[in-house]
């Protein structure tokens, strides 16, 4: 049938409990995907708490909107790279907002963690590259907040270098490989 993208799996005796081989691998991968979906919901809640600290109901609503979106539930229960990029981006958005709001100290450890999240997002899926500009924008807001101490340029340049350096060390090899193979770092011409 040409309607929709219907994925199917043939079931047989090899799929019975106790799982082994491919069936075990598929169930482990689905469990990992479900954990990534739960991570996304947790970070949606935590980000909403940062943005509206006195309104716990808003954070619960934000988490519920994510958790009970039918397509999110469907994808979270399947094996897909979408689960990794949403979980990593949700954590990256939370950390970026926490830095911008001053809830997390602008230390190199936090900036390196944000760079790691940006790199993992960029490695998981092409749309994960968008976490990088958001993280740098939030770093800019944090630097602007620190301008009273005369640190704004140092924070912006140094922090940006840490974030981009760690992100490049995590994901840069993939884009370099694409450039070498396809003369296209995004691999869109392959």
Q: Each PLM stretch: what is its role?
A:
Residues 1-32, 190:
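Interfacial juxtamembrane loops and adjacent helix segments
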Residues 158-190:
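Membrane-lumen/periplasm interface segments of specific transmembrane helices
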Residues 100-101, 131-165:
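Perimembrane helix-loop-helix junctions
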Residues 29-36, 64-68, 72-96, 108, ...:
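Multi-pass, polyprenyl lipid-linked donor-dependent membrane glycosyltransferases
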Residues 2-17, 44-68:
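Transmembrane-helix signature of polytopic, membrane-embedded enzymes
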Residues 60, 95-119, 124, 153-154:
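Short hydrophobic alpha-helices at membrane interfaces in multi-pass membrane enzymes
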Residues 31-52, 91:
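Transmembrane-helix motifs of polytopic, lipid-linked glycan transferases
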Residues 71, 112, 116-144, 168-176:
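Transmembrane helices and adjacent periplasmic/lumenal helix-loop junctions
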């Amino acid at each position: 049938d040409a309607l929709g993208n219907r994925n199917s799996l043939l079931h047989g005796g090899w799929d019975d409990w106790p799982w082994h081989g491919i069936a075990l691998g598929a169930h482990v991968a689905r469990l990992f995907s479900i954990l990534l979906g739960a991570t996304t919901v947790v970070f949606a809640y935590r980000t909403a708490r940062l943005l509206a600290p006195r309104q716990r109901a808003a954070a619960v609503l934000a988490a519920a909107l994510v958790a009970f979106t039918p397509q999110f539930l469907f994808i979270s229960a399947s094996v897909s790279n979408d689960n990794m990029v949403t979980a990593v981006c949700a954590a990256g958005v939370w950390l970026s907002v926490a830095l911008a709001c001053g809830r997390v100290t602008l230390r190199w450890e936090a900036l390196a963690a944000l760079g790691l999240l940006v790199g993992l997002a960029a490695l998981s899926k092409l749309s994960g590259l968008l976490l990088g500009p958001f993280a740098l924008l939030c770093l800019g807001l944090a630097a602007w907040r620190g301008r009273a101490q005369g640190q704004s340029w140092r924070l912006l340049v140094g922090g940006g270098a840490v974030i981009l350096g760690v992100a490049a060390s995590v994901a840069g090899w993939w884009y370099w490989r694409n450039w070498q193979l396809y003369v296209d770092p995004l691999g869109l011409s392959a």
